[in-house]
């Protein structure tokens, strides 16, 4: 099982790291150019995977062309490299490769981007279990927990989408029960690496 957290680092990052430490679990953080970006050092030094997400997470800007997203990706890559000394080669598109929002700005851009990032040596990862914590209102921790445990049931491998932004306090609250529930299902936990199985959605552009 791969636990993944998008949109951090945030005020919740250190809390998430402490929970993961308690359970002896490594996870993956797909980061943006946030005010708390220095926390990528904490993530990296704790043995988790730092992945790239976006510098701005502004759909209208990053998805207006293939080059626009690649330029944005370079910004966050350079920032992360300046902090931890390496440029990550794993990444996740905002909204995933199956997002339908991008076609409002540039039809076909996701098909172009999935090829372009791989040509640049990146491995991109979507997910096959969603926590549902991306709702505009903060969902309850039971809703988040139940989504993950129901979604992971009867799967051979799970890649769980969660979020690490300032408002996601209920994700933090749900995390211990998510981990314990997944353990009871027999899951072990690993961080994503470029060699990991690629969870790819169908592009909808």
Region roles according to the model:
Residues 15, 59-161, 165-183, 187-188, ...:
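Catalytic domains of cell-wall/extracellular-matrix polysaccharide-remodeling enzymes
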